[in-house]
Design a protein with these regions (language model features):
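Catalytic palm subdomain of template-directed nucleic-acid polymerases
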Residues: 179-193
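Short, conserved phosphate-binding/catalytic loop or strand-edge motifs used
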Residues: 170-180
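SsDNA-processing nucleotidyl-transfer enzymes
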Residues: 2-11, 40-134, 138-141, 149-153, ...
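Short beta-strand
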Residues: 57-60, 166-172, 212-216
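Secondary-structure capping and boundary motifs in well-ordered enzyme cores
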Residues: 31, 126-129, 144-147, 151, ...
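Long, well-ordered alpha-helical scaffolding segments within enzyme catalytic domains
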Residues: 38, 145-164, 191-206
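Flexible loop/turn segments at secondary-structure boundaries
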Residues: 24, 64-67, 77, 143, ...
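C-terminal accessory nucleic-acid interaction domains of nucleic acid-metabolism proteins
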Residues: 1-29, 36, 47, 51, ...
Length: 340
């Protein structure tokens, strides 16, 4: 027998939801239908984070606890109203990626087995100049979430001291994300450079809390992942449900909530009511776009003081000015140690 389907209308488009009763979160019993209904309820907030951006499809065909795969190229068999953008990757390859322009595009992706939304930090009108700087606070094993909260507040202060305003949200996992709307004037490399300078300043102010060390064996506390600003890196966007057992959400926050927020309170079954009652703390992110000039000046001062670039992700070609891409434990082998 063919798989059961449920046809719904979203933004004047009919979408057939396949296997709507399939359980996606076994711990809570949440189904694909529950996931669809969630995204319909938060669609305006979700679109604030992904509208007009190319995005990677991260597909969980059998639910959050099962195997997933990334799909950068949008499926050939798709409705005519699905928008795409041709994106170039560091490898030199290119692909037509999904651009989510309305709630129907989100629901279409959810029907493919996506759980969270993973957009690039660019708009489809300018694919080479990000309009978003992303701060990803990633706690190491055993690091208390309170250290993430405290680090986020230092990030807020550093951004403010350099003329920028950030919008915080829980990551939906163990961290916090802070997004900054910026003018689309700088390349991915320049935005990453600004993010690295900002992260190093946060580390200087709170060295016991956080680190910018790329190699895990050197890290402590909360890692400020500056490389999330490199081309082809994505983070889950606002109101994304995350593939964790209790279906936590990457939920936008007011800054006065950060010090006491509990990520486990922000779930698929609680966030729609919160959004309806409180409104969207991230709604103002597009009200002003900021300049990176102050952070880039900070980077120049770091470089003049001998603090150059930091390692890039392993799938990137060696970058000009990048230190040797060798983990410290291997560097002891000397100059012949293989780079990663």
């Amino acid at each position: 027998m063919p798989a059961p389907k449920e046809v719904i209308e979203v933004a004047s488009h009919e979408i057939a939801i396949s296997n709507p009763d399939k359980v996606f979160f076994a711990e809570r019993g949440f189904t694909k239908r529950d996931l669809v209904q969630y995204y319909l309820a938060v669609s305006e907030g979700a679109l604030a984070g992904c509208r007009d951006r190319p995005g990677t499809l991260k597909r969980f065909p059998n639910g959050a606890a099962e195997a997933f795969f990334f799909q950068k190229r949008v499926p050939e068999h798709r409705p005519p109203w699905i928008e795409t953008a041709t994106v170039h990757f560091p490898s030199g390859r290119e692909a037509a990626m999904l651009v989510m322009h309305d709630a129907a595009a989100i629901i279409w992706a959810i029907n493919l087995g996506c759980i969270d939304l993973n957009p690039w930090p660019v708009r489809n009108t300018d694919l080479d100049h990000p309009d978003e700087l992303r701060v990803d606070l990633d706690p190491g094993p055993g690091v208390a979430f309170d250290d993430v909260r405290r680090t986020a507040l230092v990030v807020r202060d550093v951004l403010g001291d350099h003329g920028l305003a950030g919008y915080p949200k829980t990551s939906g996992s163990r961290g916090i994300h802070i997004n900054v709307r910026i003018e689309p004037r700088w390349s991915f490399t320049q935005v990453r450079r600004a993010a690295l300078a900002m992260s190093r300043e946060v580390e200087r102010r709170a060295p016991a809390l956080c680190t910018t060390k790329w190699w895990k064996e050197e890290r402590h506390g909360v890692f400020l992942d500056y490389n999330q600003n490199a081309r082809d890196r994505t983070v889950a966007s606002a109101y994304s449900v995350r593939p964790v057992p209790n279906a936590r959400v990457s939920c936008p926050l007011d800054w006065d909530e950060v010090a006491a927020v509990e990520p486990d309170d922000l779930r698929l079954d609680t966030v729609p009511a919160r959004l309806a009652e409180r409104g969207d703390p991230g709604a103002g992110i597009d009200s002003a776009a900021f300049t990176l000039e102050s952070l880039l000046e900070l980077s120049e001062r770091d470089e003049a003081g001998g603090l150059g670039d930091a390692p890039w992700p392993p799938h990137f070609a060696k970058q000009e000015g990048e230190p040797r891409r060798v983990r410290p434990s291997h560097a002891r082998a000397g100059p012949d140690a293989r780079e990663e």
